[in-house]
Amino acid sequence: MKADQKHTPMMQQYLKLKAENPEILLFYRMGDFYELFYDDAKKASQLLDISLTKRGSSNGEPIPMAGVPYHAVEGYLAKLVQLGESVAICEQIGNPATSKGPVERAVVRIVTPGTVTDEALLSERIDNLIASIYHHNGKFGYATLDITSGRFQLCEPETEEAMAAELQRTSPRELLFPEDFEPVNLMASRNGNRRRPVWEFELDTAKQQLNKQFGTRDLVGFGVEGAKLGLCAAGCLIQYVKDTQRTALPHIRSLTMDKQDHSVILDAATRRNLEITQNLGGGTDNTLAEVLDHTATAMGSRMLKRWLHQPMRNISALDQRLDAIGEMKDLALFTELQPTLKQIGDIERILARLALRSARPRDMARLRQAMEYLPELAETLTQLKHPYLTQLAQYASPVDEVSELLERAIKENPPVVIRDGGVIAEGYNAELDEWRDLAAGATEFLDKLEQEERERHGIDTLKVGYNNVHGFFIQVSRGQSHLVPPHYVRRQTLKNAERYIIPELKEHEDKVLSSKSKALAIEKKLWDELFDLLLPYLERLQNIASSVSQLDVLQNLAERADTLDYCRPTMTESAGVQIQAGRHPVVEQVMDEPFIANPIDLNDQRKMLIITGPNMGGKSTYMRQTALIALMAHIGCYVPAESATIGSIDRIFTRIGASDDLASGRSTFMVEMTETANILHNATPNSLVLMDEIGRGTSTYDGLSLAWASAEWLANQINAMTLFATHYFELTELPNQIPTLANVHLDAVEHGDSIAFMHAVQEGAASKSYGLAVAGLAGVPKAVIKNARAKLTQLEALSIDSPTSKPSGVDIANQLSLIPEPSEVEQALANVDPDDLTPRQALEELYRLKKLL
């Protein structure tokens, strides 16, 4: 007996389909349910909290089964996608009436976290990306695709640190990687990782796939021909998306190179510490995006977040944005634009569903509404003069052909799905109207028949009705059933009534059902044709979506600048940051009392500030606000200050706060030192560096030595623009030794046992740390504070006599260098030229090097 003969025909069909989709859950349509079997059923019952049952047996074993109703499937899919799972949707494609054996079924779509376009499965204001990563000889290729907009990009990060930063910036919902991928730590703690065969990343295959998608002979026109590692990733990505969507992807028309040197680079730690779109707790409250994002459309919100995560260095492009925001602010145009933009809505994702032919009737109705509001938008935009804004207005101009087509084709309030018809408007197609009239005319016929039969037979309880099981029928009460004539054929007996059928009614039933099914078939055909009629306009419609998104972001930033009293920053090529009365954009919004604004001045003669002052005095806020103002200026946004001049910044680094990375077995101090090492290796004179309390996690002398050495290295070797906050007062000596350093401090005033923080930045070093006063504020018992004060007096008396209180007295003989220096062996090895040595000399050299160890 063959193995497959041990299974029923239906289970054989299921197992064949499951073998084609082994890695993902298979939703197998059976009547009104999607069923899952075997391990899929066990997994789904846990993830979705649904009952696990059994269905008969196959191969002698009971089959585990779980199911979800087809009409509620979107909710279950949303939950699975959120958990990083992919699902193959298997539908009945054969006709049950004509099928011998199981109805023919096929997988019609695969829903994956990175390729979903259905509204119910997407976060409205966050990009939904799928990405692919490739690694070779220490370098990376990385490609991302937003299937909901067609935005397809690649880049080539040169280090693992840069790759980690890209992964955090893009936050893909799904990540494809080759089976032999080595830097597996990049994959840690991520949902939606997908292992793919190595051959899918081959360069020739990738180029072939991409040229086929774009209809090109080569990729030179996209400027990506030389990015071989990036193309390997992009090729795998486009193939995977085609496999899962099982349809053409006409909205993906180009591939762009994302060049690192065009952006201000933010590493993973910096994005986390600055709380740009996500706070340290993982939420979205009290983030920069929450303050800045009052956009009218979801697509505008997504664009603003892309700007925030990828600040630009191109000063002319930034000035263009600032000019546009300034003009909108001066005209207060945002008050007119916002209501119109809200009516246009999120057409970007509707267009993606249109391109994938998965749009629903209400998508078409919303697209029609958006088209109706474009003339109103164009009218408002006529007030604008700046070339950037007039060009956006031009791209956002109405497409009359699309408006007219949707107006004629779609009913005013169509149903959710096309399945039961009622979507295509009357007057759009004469044949459809004819069949609909025939079906509608049924009501008149039935009313007339009911009246005639009542009068003819004298049965006043006679009624004509219809249900899905028995079709049309004549119903007579049990008390009058003796009056029915002989040609009435009984169809059903109820408790208080009898139901009959007569030839005229049966003939009418056939005609009505035939006209309804004919009308539905024509309507579905017209629906499919509507996609064909709209697709030629897809590129123009996508340009409209992009332009409207940009207009939304710009009007939003103009409104924020006006409402929150922001100023226009001056962008310059030279390195430096000069801010008058700068404020923290988030903290000032959550404070009850007025925010104390502070200045900062970093220039060629003043590259580093050593910041001292009490805990809770505002050092971290001051540092973060400087970085956030610089970041906002580099997206072309007005900033919270009286005035600001921001030089060209290539990277922003932060070493602020830390916690144990228990999952990776790294202590707080190890995390701190790893981030410090990254800064010391990668910062440049054009970088903005924030260093907060370096060296806290180790002994006093170790910490002081590391902080001192790090500050010296940043000042002398790198010459980066640095804000260096410290509780080591010894570091305030550094400005006396290095001319480009300066001391600033945040002060506090003690009054008895209480303390008042001034939050104002002043020149010079702080006089004391006020640590005991802060401990008192935190609720440390008074007896403990008193004991600590006595101990402090003792230690201060000792330090007056002890030379070790000065950095010069620190014993560094047993300290390892934070900045690696070549050992004696390495220096000797560097001087050896193997090509000049005889075998004997080489052996002698080897012995000599051995002795140096």
Swiss-Prot record:
Q: Which domain of life is it from?
A: Bacteria
Q: Which Pfam families match?
A: MutS_I (PF01624), MutS_II (PF05188), MutS_III (PF05192), MutS_IV (PF05190), MutS_V (PF00488)
Binding-site positions, ATP: 613-620
> Tell me, what is an example of a GO biological process annotation in this record?
mismatch repair
Matching CDD domains: ABC_MutS1
Keywords in alphabetical order = ATP-binding, DNA damage, DNA repair, DNA-binding, Nucleotide-binding
Question: Which is one Gene Ontology cellular component term of this protein?
Answer: cytosol
Q: Does the keyword DNA damage apply?
A: yes
One GO MF term attached to the UniProt entry: ATP binding
SUPFAM superfamilies registered for this protein in UniProt: DNA repair protein MutS, domain I, DNA repair protein MutS, domain II, DNA repair protein MutS, domain III, P-loop containing nucleoside triphosphate hydrolases
Role: This protein is involved in the repair of mismatches in DNA. It is possible that it carries out the mismatch recognition step. This protein has a weak ATPase activity.
In the record, the note on similarity to other proteins reads: Belongs to the DNA mismatch repair MutS family.
Q: Which NCBIfam families match?
A: mutS1, PRK05399.1
This protein's name: DNA mismatch repair protein MutS
User: What would be the name of the gene that encodes this protein?
Assistant: mutS
